[in-house]
From Swiss-Prot:
Bilayer-crossing regions: none
Gene that encodes it: rplC
Modifications made to the protein after synthesis: Methylated by PrmB.
Biased composition (Polar residues): 135-152
Function of the protein: One of the primary rRNA binding proteins, it binds directly near the 3'-end of the 23S rRNA, where it nucleates assembly of the 50S subunit.
Keyword Amino-acid biosynthesis attributed: no
UniProt GO molecular function: rRNA binding; structural constituent of ribosome
Quaternary structure note: Part of the 50S ribosomal subunit. Forms a cluster with proteins L14 and L19.
The organism of origin for this protein: Agrobacterium fabrum (strain C58 / ATCC 33970)
Pfam families from the UniProt entry: Ribosomal_L3
Residue ranges, annotated region (Disordered): 131-155
Family stated for the protein in its record: Belongs to the universal ribosomal protein uL3 family.
An annotated GO cellular component: cytosolic large ribosomal subunit
Keyword vocabulary terms for this entry: Methylation, Ribonucleoprotein, Ribosomal protein, RNA-binding, rRNA-binding
Protein name: Large ribosomal subunit protein uL3
């Protein structure tokens, strides 16, 4: 099990393959990703590496974190993420991870925080069909309808799909293909859409499930 990387979502574009077909891709940028700390079985009870990405001003960094970064001899980072790894895949503190950490054609799992949509109704949030446009409908065109029975069960079931806050949740999209990488510019091009807004932090890992054949 290898470490993943921390990236920033730049946006979407398209590239063309050898057959002239266009492929929609999301551009992810690696911004000075370095190993800040290690976790070992002897000391911590598990094996992991802590990565830092981006750059943070010293005045905006807490005193405790300043000491943490100084011990690793790295500049203060804007984002810290820990990745579980197998003991043979531990990376030295201070090492820099680049875009060639991934190879073209491999599958990755991408984690991000979806764009918040605020308070949304059941039709937008859960794709409900809504009520009838006319013929007996009284101000219930977009209502979610009944939420439960009468005496039994006498309550609303947990998990009942209703109106509420939509988006702003942590989502992992699995088995996205790496179309290409650019080590010089620190770019990874991933096929398809990735959760999150432009500029948001994204976590990219090796895929844990093989794609369905």
């Amino acid at each position: 099990m290898r470490s993943g990387v921390i990236a920033q979502k730049v946006g979407m574009t398209r590239v063309y393959n050898d057959a002239g077909e266009h492929i929609p891709v999301t551009v992810l940028r690696l911004d000075n990703v370095q190993v800040v700390a290690q976790r070992t079985e002897d000391k911590n009870g598990y094996t992991a590496v802590q990565l830092g990405a981006g750059q943070s001003k010293v005045k905006n960094t807490t005193k405790a974190l300043r000491g943490h970064f100084a011990a690793a001899n790295v500049e203060p980072k804007a984002k810290l993420v820990e990745f579980r790894v197998s003991p043979e895949n531990l990376i030295d503190i201070g090492a820099t991870l680049t875009a060639n950490h991934f190879q073209s054609g491999q599958l990755v799992d991408v984690t991000g925080t979806t764009i918040g949509k605020g308070f949304a109704g059941a039709m937008k949030r859960h794709n409900f069909g809504g009520g009838r446009a006319s013929h007996g409908n009284s101000v219930s065109h977009r209502a979610h309808g009944s939420t439960g029975n009468n005496q039994d069960p006498g309550r609303v079931w947990k998990g009942k799909r209703m109106a509420g806050h939509m988006g702003q949740t942590r989502v992992t999209t699995q088995n996205l293909e790496v179309v290409s990488t650019d080590e010089d510019r620190g770019l990874i091009l991933v096929k398809g859409a990735v959760p999150g807004s432009k500029g948001s932090w994204i976590i990219v890992r090796d895929a844990v499930k093989s794609a369905a054949k």
